[in-house]
Amino acid sequence: TNEHKFEAGTPRIAEAIGWSAALDWMDSFDLDAEHARLVKIASWVAKELRAMGMTVYGRHEEHDAAVVSFLHPTINSEDMAHLLDSRGFAVRTGHHCAQPLLNRLGITGTVRASFYVYNTREEAEGLVQELKEITEKFA
């Protein structure tokens, strides 16, 4: 018998080719070096945000992830995210699957910026600059 006659629909050929190309692209990176580069960027962003008077959650001096969660003392996190989005920056807001922790901290949500292999230092600098402008205008 031909077992292929029992498969419904078209095989996911394009998806398999795309997945293979994505894996090849990821193999082109030295992931340890990329991780170190991204952690350095996240640590710099955290330092800049603290200097602007924002609360940064996490220990960025011993940072092991390229993620910065922060909160401005007077600008709502959802408003901050909307303003950043309108300026071309994609961030996340809300509980980030950590609602019990945020409840314990007495906050309703944070803004989270995440950096990955396709992000540059210049983009991080642009994010910080936009946050400075937003803070000056709306705080």
Label every PLM stretch briefly:
Residues 1-139:
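Pyridoxal 5′-phosphate
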